[in-house]
Amino acid sequence: MRKIVLPGDLLSTNPRAAGYGTYVEGGKVYAKIIGLFDQTETHVRVIPLKGRYTPSVGDVVIGIIREVAANGWAVDIYSPYQAFLPVSENPEMKPNKKPNEVLDIGDAIIAKVLNIDPKMKVTLTMKDRICRPIRFGRIVAINPARVPRVIGKKGSMIKLLKSELDVQIVVGQNGLIWVNGDRRKVSIAEEAIYLIEQEAHTEGLTDRVAEFIKRRKADVGIQ
């Protein structure tokens, strides 16, 4: 899962893997900025924390369990504000189970923002069809400010990714995106998402993404 890295943190021993937010020194790749560490099969990069996510009630988010308590779970939603999932808001919690038997530290979940109190403490719920623990698939991390572009007008961009690649995608408003399906198609979806993030300010992006997917599918022999 994605973690926060600081300038100077070692990211890779392969200098050819150096991506955005990194630098190479002595044949090794280090973080140049503070941000989210993101790794693909070929590259490592650091996603800036500028534009960090500010939660709103009803938002779908993807988070990582950081602490387990008797009454619920502390969840990192990559926001300056704390998030908590009460046991009463997790349908998988049963009377004969302990919280750490349902979700443990390091587990990833899809949840919704249920409430935000005046001190910006965030309460999450998993009582929604879209919510689930993430047991498989891949999590892609982008700048939260680019989420609307990944979704597209009236969901057009996300529909394109799903229909062309036949993958499941859940976009968290906090910049974490869950992708599940055939491994090769998931990899192409991940690449396409990064393309959208990088070129979010440009025109004609939907057509370029469609062409990119078509080309990458041909490269790996997908009809």
From Swiss-Prot:
Gene that this sequence comes from: rrp4
Pfam families named in the record: ECR1_N_2, KH_6, RRP4_S1
Organism of derivation: Archaeoglobus fulgidus (strain ATCC 49558 / DSM 4304 / JCM 9628 / NBRC 100126 / VC-16)
GO cellular component terms given for this protein: cytoplasm; exosome (RNase complex)
Keyword set, alphabetical order: Cytoplasm, Exosome, RNA-binding
NCBIfam families in the record: PRK04163.1-1
Annotated protein name in UniProt: Exosome complex component Rrp4
CDD domains named in the record: KH-I_Rrp4_prokar, S1_Rrp4_like
S1 motif domain location: 58-127
An example Gene Ontology biological process: RNA catabolic process
